């Protein structure tokens, strides 16, 4: 189970 940045939502705010 790897967390990929492309799967994660844009939480830059």
Swiss-Prot record:
Superkingdom as given in the UniProt entry: Eukaryota
Keywords: Morphogen
GO biological process, one term: anatomical structure morphogenesis
An annotated Gene Ontology molecular function: morphogen activity
Biological role: Morphogenetically active peptide. Active in foot development.
UniProt name for this protein: Pedin
Biological source species: Hydra vulgaris (Hydra)
